[in-house]
UniProtKB/Swiss-Prot annotation:
Cellular localization per UniProt: Secreted; Target cell membrane
Tissue-by-tissue expression: Expressed by the venom gland.
Entries under PROSITE patterns matching the protein: SNAKE_TOXIN (PS00272)
Predominant place of localization: secreted
GO molecular function, one term: toxin activity
Protein known as: Cardiotoxin 7a
Family indicated by similarity: Belongs to the three-finger toxin family. Short-chain subfamily. Orphan group XV sub-subfamily.
Length: 83
């Protein structure tokens, strides 16, 4: 009986497909974050290139790493709250 119950629990978990959701910071403050929507598997952080202090000006989730611009340098990562 216990084996049957355990099997049902495992099958339920597999069928639910609990899926992995990435959490990324989304403000300049390092303790505020959001869960990324499906398909957004990267966190990014943008800093000003010409400014001596490299504090982030923009953070969030992305499906692809944004390209650097004349003003902003982007750094991407794929682990929890890595930006």
């Amino acid at each position: 009986m216990k084996t049957l119950l355990l099997t049902l629990v495992v099958v339920t978990i597999v069928c639910l497909d609990l899926g992995y959701t990435l959490k990324c910071h989304n403000t300049q403050l390092p303790f505020i974050y959001k869960t990324c929507p499906e398909g957004k598997n990267l966190c990014f952080k943008a800093t000003l290139k010409k400014f001596p202090l490299k504090f982030p000006v923009k953070r969030g989730c992305a499906d692809n790493c944004p390209k650097n611009s004349a003003l902003l340098k982007y750094v991407c990562c794929s682990t929890e709250k890595c930006n």
